[in-house]
Amino acid sequence: MSLSNNQTQFVTVFVPIQLSIDVFRKMNNINSFVNDNLTNFPIVTVDQLIKVVNNNNNNNNNNNNNNNNNNNNTSISNNGDINNCLATFEQVQNNCFETCDFKATEREHYFASGKQIQESVLPEEEEEKISVNNFAMVTVEPNNCFVKAQQINSVAPLSLDNRNCVRRAHREVNTFVQVFDVCVFNLKVVNVATNESQVNLFNGGNVENICFDRSIQMPRSSADDFDWSSQQQSSWYSLALSIIPIYHEIILVLCNWLVVAFYKYWQHQQQKQLPPHPLNIIVPNVSKRIAVNLNNQLISLTFTNFLKNIFFLNNNNNNNNNNNNNNNNNNNNNNNNNNNNKTNNNQLNLSKEICNENLNFEEFNFEDESVCKYNRLTNSCENISKIQQVNEESELLDWFSDFEEMDSVLLQNGTEFDNDHPMVKSQAPSITFKSLDQFIKYLEENNCVDDIEVSPCSKSHTFNRPVSTPRLIIKPTWCVYGDSLNTEFFHSCLKDKTCGDIIVDHFEPLVSSPTDFLLSNGGQRILDTPNAGGSSVWSEVLSFEVLNQVFGAQLKKTETEIEYAPGSKITDFSVDINNSHIGVSVVRIINFFDLNGRTYKAVFTPEYARNLLYKKLFGVIASTEAVVDKWEKQILYVWTTSSCVADIIVQEYWKVPAKLRSNTLVYVNHATNSEFLF
C-alpha cells in the first residue's frame, strides 16, 4: 500500500511514551514517590519531554554523537538540534505508538518494554497480565513526523481501547514509566526498519481510516518461528495485514448477494407455471395485412408481437362449434338470434377482407419462424420462406393509426368534447346571474326558494351536533377557542364537495396593537400586497393566520393575483388545504356595535342576518363561477363583535335555500378586544 507524496495530512493520535524514572522525577519536580500514587501525577506532554531533552544536551554530548552515527538514515532536524534530541530519546528508552483518532469497534494493542505489565484496560474490565511477545519498537519524533522501528526482545503487549482509555502504566519503580499524550502529527513519511533496514510503507496521502500500528507491529500471537530478519517478509506481512480486512468485507458482500440471488431463484422456481391455453380471439387487421391462425398456440400480447403484425383468427373447428352454439342460442331466444347473426356476418366480412379471393390464409410457425400458406378449399398447405423483416417504425405508426381510427368511431357518439360541450363550458369562467335578484327569480321559477334541506350528509353537517368539550388553541400573539369538534367538522366539510356547513369559534388577541402580531409568510404577503380596495387588510391577514395555524392552510394567491371573467364578483384570497384549492371571502359585521363607546348602535335582527347571508353567499357562487383557476370549494369567513350576532347567523344559515348555500363553508369568528379589525 502506498499513498501519494504530494499532499500534507494531519492526524490526531494518542502517544504512549516510556520515560526513565529520573526524567519523570525531574519533569514533575518529584524527589520520590510510591507505586500506588504514580497514576495521580499530571500527564507528561511531548513539549515537556523536548524541554527536558534540551536541558540534558550538555550532559549527553558523547552519547548523542554515537547515536547519530547509528541512525543517519532516520534522523531529521528538530529546530537545529535533532542529533541531541534523538540521542536523548533513545537514552530514556521512550516507546511511542500512534493510532488514528477515529471510532473503532475492535481493540487495539499497544506495547511497552518489560516482561510483565499490569494495567487497567477499561474501568469495568479486570486487570490482566499478558506474556512477553516479540514486537517492533517504534520511536516517534513528533515535531518532524518521522517514525522508525527497531526489533527488540522482551516486549509485552498492553491492551487499550481506542480513543477512550488514555492511561498511565508503570512497571518498576527504579526503571521507567509509561505516560500518554495526545499529539497532532503532520504525517509525510512513515518508515519501518527491521535490523537496520528500512521499508517505506507510507508516503503521505489520506490517513483518515488508517491505523498505523497495524502496519508496523509484529504478530499479535506468538511468532517465535517467524524469521523477522528478512526485510521482504516484514513488508509483505505488513501489507497483508492492511489488505485482509478489505477483502474480508468484499467477501461478505459477495456472499450476501449470492444468498439473496439464490433465494430469489428458488422462489421463482417454486411458482406454479400455468399451462398454455388455446387462443380463441378474433382481432381484425385494419391495415388488411396477413392474418395468422394461432389456435392451440401460446403467445404473449406484447409490443414486439404487434411489430410483427400478428393477429388472430379462429380455425374451422372452432368456427363450427361457435356456429352450433349460436344456433342453439338462436332456438332458445329469437332476439339473441338476430344479434348473433349480425355478429357472425360482421366476422365473416372481416375474414373476407383479410383473406384473399381463394380463401387462403397464412399460419405462423413459432418454432422456425416460418409462414405456412393454407387453402381452405383444397386443404393444402404451402410453406413459405421465413417472415421478412419489417420496418418497425412504419409498423409502429400503422399500429397507432389503427387505434386512432377506432377512437374516431367511438367519438362519433358524442364523447368527443369541443368548446361547445356543456362539460367544457362549465369549466370556463362565465357569469350566469349578474345580480342577486336574477338568482332569486331563478330559484322561484324552479321552486327552490323553500328548499331548505340541511345537507345530504346529515350525520356530519347539521345543526344537531353532539355536545363536546371546548378546545383552546394558543399562539404567541392570539388564541382561538370553541367546540372541540369544530376542527373535525371543518375538514369533513372541505372533503364533501356537495354541501356546506357553518362553524363558530371565538378569537382573542394577546397583543394590544396589530403591529405586534407574529405573522407567517403568507400573512406577511397579504399585508404587503395591495388589495382591491377597502380597509379590511387586517381582517384578511388574521383570517389567513387562523386558517394557517389552526387548519393547516397555505396561501396560494392574493386578491389581486386571482383572475376572473370581466365584471364578476371577487374573492379575497385562495389557499391550499390538504391538496384542495379553496377560495376565501372575508366579511365584517360592524354596523351594530360601537366599539369605542361599548354600546349597541342598532339591533342585529334575523332579517338583516338573512339578507346578509343571501348577499354574501351569492357573491361566493358568482366568483366561483367566474374564476379562471377553478377552486373546489369556498369559505365565507365572518368576523363579528358579539356572540349574539354569531348565534343569529347560525340560526338563519339553515333557513337559506340549499342551492344558495351550495357547498360554501361559513366560518364565524366572534372577536373580542379587536377594534383594529373593524
Swiss-Prot record:
The keyword Transmembrane applies. Disulfide bonds: none annotated. Keywords: Membrane, Repeat, Transmembrane, Transmembrane helix. GO terms for cellular component: membrane. It is a single-pass membrane protein. It is found in: Membrane. Residues 55-75, 318-347 are annotated as: Disordered. The chain crosses the membrane at residues 243-263. Its main location: membrane. Signal peptide: none annotated. Residues 55-73, 318-346 have a biased composition (Low complexity). Several proteins derive from AAC-rich mRNA, which, due to a frameshift also have ACA and CAA codons and thus are Asn-, Thr- or Gln-rich. This is AAC-rich mRNA clone AAC4 protein. It comes from Dictyostelium discoideum (Social amoeba).
